Amino acid sequence: MKVKLLLTAITLSCLAIDVLAQVSISGKIVSADTNEPVVGANIRIDQSLSGCTTNDKGEFSISNLPDGKHVLRITHVSYTPKSITTKGGEKNLLIKLQDSFTNIGQVVVTGTGTHHRMTDSPVPVSVITAKDLSNASVTSLDEALQKLTPSFSSMTNGMGTTLSLNGLPDDYFIFLENGKRLYGDDTYARINVAKIKRIEILNGASSALYGTNAIGGVINIITDDVKNAINVSSDTRYASKGRFTQSVNIDVNTGKFGSYTSYRRQQAEGWQLNPYEENSKTHELEETGKVASTGFYANTVNQKFTFDATDKLSFYARGGYYDNKTRRPYEAYDYNILHETFNYGIGAQYMINKGNYITADCYADHFSSSYCFFKDNKTYNGKAGEEQVRKRTRNHNLSIKGIFKLGNRHKLSVGTEYIVDVLKSQTDNIAKEDAYTLALFAQDEIKLLRNLQALIGVRYIYHENFKNHATPNVALMYKPGKFNFRASYAAGFRTPTLSELYATDIAKKNDRLTIGNLDLKPEKNNYFSLSAEYVHERFSVSVNAFYNNIRDMIDYNTIATGDKAMEQYGHKEVRQRDNIAEAKVHGINVSANAYLGAGFNLSGGYTHLTVSYTHLRAHETL
């Protein structure tokens, strides 16, 4: 009993000492040139997970810190990064930041999975900042990427907008939100632009770090979790064709606990390019109500809770809901299309010491696509007023990652990932199909010399259907003075989706049946790039040349036509997904940015692509 009482007393004493040892740091950040407050500056404590952002008066406060010296690292897109050392719980700090006329101090994480200033990353990463988004007055992520990055292009049809990156469709690159992969359809439509802090864009294969599908590039959306006590914002935009966007954000932070809530409403009217279309039988023009861009309404709700147990251990839980329903003209269509997504996840991060930390994340994404009939439809046997679920997908992801600084020359990233994909489809007669993927990855960032660094990584993948595969990547960076020279190679890997393996599809405009193929093989690629960059305080210019060779591309192979197709399949044309193509994409990206003075910036970019697409064998028809 005495021993128990003694242990209890010691424990309570330690807790009391720990409470008494907690200190706070507060102050104000201003411009060194104008003494005006700097709003939205990010302050992070070195060797800690604690941090905050400045309010509209440039003020900040960070509490629950252990007593002793602390290094504050301050960053802002318009200012040069700065670090200062404080002693204990200092109050009323006045920190002055120097103006930065270009984004040379921007911190990025996508290229290597670890934090680097953009000019110090061995893998080239381009950045779109919140300031860029505001200046461009964009309301959606796809609009932002098209306006602000020449590597992106889009195609709009009656079903919506699809993006391409360096000539490759969105099946070949992935979207991340704060480093967490987004699954399912409508990935970029779910992002609330009002919450974006920056967008990091990695061109080229990165399967070693980010897994399957990342053979064309990675887009990482970093959102802004404000650390002020209370932050409420609202943004309303209206444009032609009834395009309306309303965003509301409510953030509450009490020190250890944080709540971040966002809601966005989008809607638009449909529009036509031509009120006439050609009759497929008579080849004569006739009036049509079909649209080039479909009207829609969409709602996005996201909620995130955080808990900072200590300055080295933090937890989060998050969830979200998204829906998008078309508004198609009654005279031209039989049904609307409804997409719904809900997702949830939990995670934790523990900082062992400076440069060493472990993260664990568990995430799930549920997506469904449905036909909402307002007329009877023979193709899908739909009745007016009915709703028919076309497809349901579920993605479950569990990942653990550790980053360890080994001496002064090595930074090692290791981790594992387990993914389960599930597909159900009423219209495709798929009761349930699923597959799992297990991955192990390792990457080492090596400082060879003062101005020379290398990166070597590999991912091992075991897929339930496609077994073993490995994807390596290598990068080298030489940095003499204000110049940066980079060279890289990466192998990519894309497994066929469950829809490509199992799903069937009936075309809406002609009598054509598309069927799955259980004999599909993974698509593979080799990506090479060379880049040169010059960075000055007032201007920067970069040139990047690349070559991407994709093998075993999945395309459509016509297997039956005419009477034989009708006899065997009941349709005039039948095609099957198959590995029948090879694509070679090579090109050059040029970008430049200059500060002209008096608050004026001039920036521009140019992308030149050459794409060759070869069918490996002729169509086989019955």
Residues covered by each model-derived region:
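Gram-negative outer-membrane beta-barrel transporters
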Residues: 408, 447-451, 547-549, 569-617
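Surface-exposed extracellular loop regions of Gram-negative outer-membrane beta-barrel proteins
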Residues: 325, 366-370, 429-431, 464-469, ...
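N-terminal periplasmic accessory domains that precede
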Residues: 90-96, 141-144, 148, 161-164, ...
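Short acidic/polar hinge/loop motifs at secondary-structure boundaries
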Residues: 61-64, 153, 180-205
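Extracytoplasmic beta-strand/coil segments of soluble accessory domains associated
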Residues: 125, 142-180
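Short, acidic, small-residue-rich periplasmic hinge/interaction motif at the N-terminus
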Residues: 30-34, 41-46, 73-79, 87-134, ...
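Face-selective signature of the C-terminal outer-membrane beta-barrel domain
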Residues: 306-324, 339-466, 472-479, 539-546, ...
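Periplasmic-side early beta-strands and strand-to-turn transitions of outer-membrane beta-barrels
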Residues: 227-229, 237, 252-337
